[in-house]
Amino acid sequence: MIGHSKPGEGESSDAMAARIDHVLGMMGKPEKFFWCGKLGAGLAAKISNNYISCTFVLVIAEAMAMGIRNGIDPKLLHEVIHNSSGQSFMADHVNPVPGVVPHAPSSNNWRLGFKTQMMVKDIGLGVEAAKRVGIAPTMAEAAIEVWKKAAEDPRCIDRDGSSIWLYLNDIKDE
């Protein structure tokens, strides 16, 4: 997410855009570059995306717990969500239930992907950004309180954020 116009577009300096493109090209794939326009727009896009990601992990953990406690097999519930309107990258790759998605951190002892403590930081940035532009971030304000508690829980500290599953379900750490 780049706070600059794409080379050849907008009012930006083509020389600057070309330079940015060249430098970033050494670090990643151009098809993964999102030229967001003016300075700061790339950061706004990143904060918006992280706002969604942080709330999704919490919502997925709560929804999976609800379904499992109602007797639904965790893998079946994941398949239902994957093939329905609840499908998301986070549900498919960061599902917080151990054993549901083999490559997910939860299936690998919550081996670090993105720390629980960082979830608090990122959702906090989202709350601040929303308020700055006149949006009432009601969902994120509720979510950040849960994330703060999980970030202080020894079962979640310095583990992937999907370890919030342990906190929400009060599961003893093995």
Give each language-model segment a name.
Residues 24-28, 81, 168:
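Hydrophobic aliphatic residues
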Residues 41-167:
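Helical "substrate-binding/catalytic lid" subdomain
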Residues 1-54:
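Rossmann-fold dinucleotide-binding core
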Residues 170-174:
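Hydrophobic alpha-helical segments
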